[in-house]
Amino acid sequence: MAKRVKVVLNETINKLGFTGDLVEVAPGYARNYLIPKGLGVVATPGILRQVEQRRLKELERLKAEKDAAEARKVALETIGRFVIKKQVGEAEAIFGTVTTQEVADAVEAATNQSLDRRGISLPDIHKTGFYQAQIKLHPEVIATVEVQVAPL
């Protein structure tokens, strides 16, 4: 009897592997737990080809997402500056602060592209002026734009 059996995982299992991974496990673990519960299948050449095809499709999808994010970055950095108008008090201090939602709304108004406010990082803004904002469009793509806070 074989000491280890190769299994392709259908689901992520803690301390074993992720979906689509080829892992070697004890025959009893595969026969009595993984296969009956649908968590894995015995690795055959056909199954391995299917897993490889899925992996290639996933890589293509991830590359397409990154390319789209790069295009959005170029578009945002071409515009470069977004203006946010706020009510101003003494010494050019604004009432309240500039929020990430306001920046997202300004970007959407200028580009017709919606942004998730959680991907925007701003310094603390309490006065009028120019500030740098970083917009995370993808885990590997970050656009830097200028935010101008102007009096209303």
From Swiss-Prot:
In terms of PROSITE patterns, this protein maps to: RIBOSOMAL_L9 (PS00651)
Annotated Gene Ontology cellular component terms: cytosolic large ribosomal subunit
What InterPro entries would the database entry show? Ribosomal_bL9, Ribosomal_bL9/RNase_H1_N, Ribosomal_bL9_bac/chp, Ribosomal_bL9_C, Ribosomal_bL9_C_sf, Ribosomal_bL9_N, Ribosomal_bL9_N_sf
**Highest taxon of the lineage:** Bacteria
The entry lists its GO molecular-function terms as: rRNA binding; structural constituent of ribosome
Gene3D superfamilies in alphabetical order: Ribosomal protein L9, C-terminal domain, Ribosomal protein L9, N-terminal domain
Gene Ontology BP annotations: translation
Which keywords are on file for this protein?
Answer: Ribonucleoprotein, Ribosomal protein, RNA-binding, rRNA-binding
Q: Does the keyword Ribonucleoprotein apply?
A: yes
Q: What's its job?
A: Binds to the 23S rRNA.
Q: Per its UniProt record, what HAMAP family does this chain match?
A: Ribosomal_bL9
Task: Give the family per the record.
Answer: Belongs to the bacterial ribosomal protein bL9 family.
Q: What's the protein name?
A: Large ribosomal subunit protein bL9
Organism this protein belongs to? Synechocystis sp. (strain ATCC 27184 / PCC 6803 / Kazusa)
Q: Which gene encodes it?
A: rplI
